[in-house]
Amino acid sequence: MKTTGANSASGRPHPAVLTDFDDTAAVQNVAEMLLNRFGDPGWKDVRQRFRDGHINLKEYQEITFRNIRADRATMQAYVKEHANLRPFFRELWGFCQANDIPMAVVSQGLDFYISALLDREGLSRVPVYAVNTEFRHGEISYHYNHTYPGKESQGNSKGFVVESFQERGCYVFFAGDGHSDQEAARKADVTFAHRTLAKFCDDESIPYHPFEDFRGILLAVREYSKNGHGPIRERPGSSQWGGEAEL
């Protein structure tokens, strides 16, 4: 689904920015950082089963965090000490706030570690669409609130969140890096991709812009807000948003 409606005063769709978290908004894969520090020694075997397609991301995540040797506060403190947001995330959020543009983190990861990094950076107001967790009696329970009806067993869907913004009349800019971002990349109006998502887009002939940090998205959203058109959807290496530009 691509946005076709218009709901802004200018008569064009209002922009919205959605970004993956692990390896995209965050420099690191924060989930794996926590598993390396606090997880069961066999967690990488479970990850390989996921990579080989034997289990889905929801199953992989619940299995590996089931035996984590730390409580919520300990893991959040570790995230605040060791994780970092990618450059220009804060600037993009500031621009979006100043111009009434929705911006949110969309993740199949766990809410408690995402909120920890955002809190440390003073960005606790950034909306987060992730797996909601509850810590009780040494166990974690998981709640999947962002999924298509009947597909709850597959976990959260980033494509579902993209569509929910488009149904509100938004022109969606999306950034991601991995397998869980593929559905969103197909549905977003403009996609910024790196790592395995970029390869997937190449293989599937899905137009995208190369992603290194949030500079390019900031420029693209600012241009759309000013002139009423998004960037031309190009192949890597030719993107007008990939090089140096004055902010």
Kindly label every feature range from the protein language model.
Residues L18-D20, V106, A175:
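Short hydrophobic segments within beta-strands
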Residues K2-I63:
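Active-site neighborhood of HAD-like aspartate-dependent phosphohydrolases
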Residues F88-P102, G109-L247:
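C-terminal cap/substrate-recognition subdomain and adjoining C-terminal extension
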